[in-house]
Amino acid sequence: LKRFLRFIQPEDMRTEREKDIWDLKKLDIPIQENPIYKTETLDFTVILQEGLREEVKQAIFLHIKYEKIATVKRELTSIRKFSGYLVEKGVKINSCADVDRDLLEEYLIHINTNGSSGRGNSDDILKLRAVLESVGKLYGYSHLESLFINTDIPPEVQPVFRSYSDAELM
């Protein structure tokens, strides 16, 4: 059924970077990927704000050139979560230029109190930071480059190793 629907659809003449779902083979840049976990597409439709989506596409295209595709997918996931949060809270923004420190702090409180793990949260924050800083550099939104402070990223919980004597093990 999918093949039939694709067959009857008119061919999309836009460049791959203009589309909301990128076919990585059509980007004409080398992709650093894991051969076991094949990634063929990147889906930007999960970013619900149109202007935000277009800005993020440019940043992600830049990142694809220098980072492994798994890292880029993780960045896209962090932006998707941020976009979902904006919709959930009814925050109306259409550009990364509208993201300010107050909004970021509300989001940080949300992700740190929703019950998910600390490791995932710190990785999400790092990836969100990378994308927003890239958008800031590409579009001249200088406030995005200094939006995050070091204490925004929760420290990873370090495991405590303990040694046991033979007597304790028996």
Task: Please give the residue ranges for each predicted region.
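Charge-rich, intrinsically disordered N-terminal extensions
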Residues: 1-160
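Short, intrinsically disordered, charge-balanced linker/junction segments flanking boundaries
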Residues: 160-170
